[in-house]
Amino acid sequence: RENGGQYTHSAIWVIIAETMLGFGDKATELYRMINPIEHARTKEASKKYKVEPYVIAADVYGASNLAGQGGWTWYTGSSSWYYKAGIEYILGLKIEKGYMKIEPCIPKEWKEYQIQYKWKESIYNIRIKNTNGKNMGVSEIKLNGEKIENYIKLDGSRNIYQIEVTM
């Protein structure tokens, strides 16, 4: 049933690998392909997919009589990997041991995006600018207007931080 189809865990690992290689366009294209909403945009597509359009399927069948049908939607760990691929590897927001690091790998066409991250009682308003149309590579990070290195120590003391990332 999975021959020639989509095995979601491995497909997500391919997305992560694409970002590690700096291929943000391809990574985002694959990310969108796996998105269950993309399998249910029309009534016909929903009938073919046959599973919930709001849950990641463990696999999407490739055999001709089942081609495009999702399977094992509530029985997979793929959703956590999908979330991780999107947040940490494409958008580039990584949190580890009390520090934030921002390393996006995005499509060249994305000129700007924003993330608001709450940690304990603090809020981090993050604006990523990609005016040069790059897939990856951070040239500058400013925290509240001051240039800093890429590791930001998280502070949970009810502060609001403005982070500007230039690619």
Residue ranges: model-predicted function:
Residues 1-6, 12-167:
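Non-catalytic C-terminal accessory modules of carbohydrate-active enzymes
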